[in-house]
Amino acid sequence: MVGFVPKEMFFTKGVGKHREKLTSFELALRSAGIAACNLVRVSSIFPPKCRILPRAEGMKRLEPGQVTFVVMSEAATREPHRLIAATVGVAIPRDRDIYGYLSEHHSFGESEDIAGDYAEELAAEMLATTLGLEFDPDKSWDEKKEVYQLSNQIVRTQNVTQTAVGDKKGLWTTVVAAAVLVG
């Protein structure tokens, strides 16, 4: 039996606020455009030959009630003015016949750039170690990125990140970021 190997993927993100945590999460999913799907969280493999679609094109592939596989990150707070972030990063190998990595990260107090770079770094490190590339945990992300690019084996990294500041009146604030696997 051959399993489902997605050929396409898209990134999405959203934020929701409500007095109830669950409703805040639902509103974040609605903001991301994926609330009408039955979401199944999967681990962090970017399939071989998978193509990243623009969000609008990917959304056309979804139907209400559809079982939909996602790599998703979420963060929530009801602490006023607290910065939260949810991010998913991807590292794509040059050889499209092998798999890459997706990584999810959620945090408090990190900007969009810091959280997004961290998710990319996680994905790139997982791919680099799979490919047998040099890995030095003491190097900065910029130094590692340069090594990976020079190796000519990792073609690109990117992320989708949603940040928000906790509601000033203490409502639940939830952020989500997702890689949605379709096709």
Protein language model annotation of sequence segments:
Residues 1-183:
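Helix-coil modules at protein/domain termini and other flexible surface or pore-lining loops
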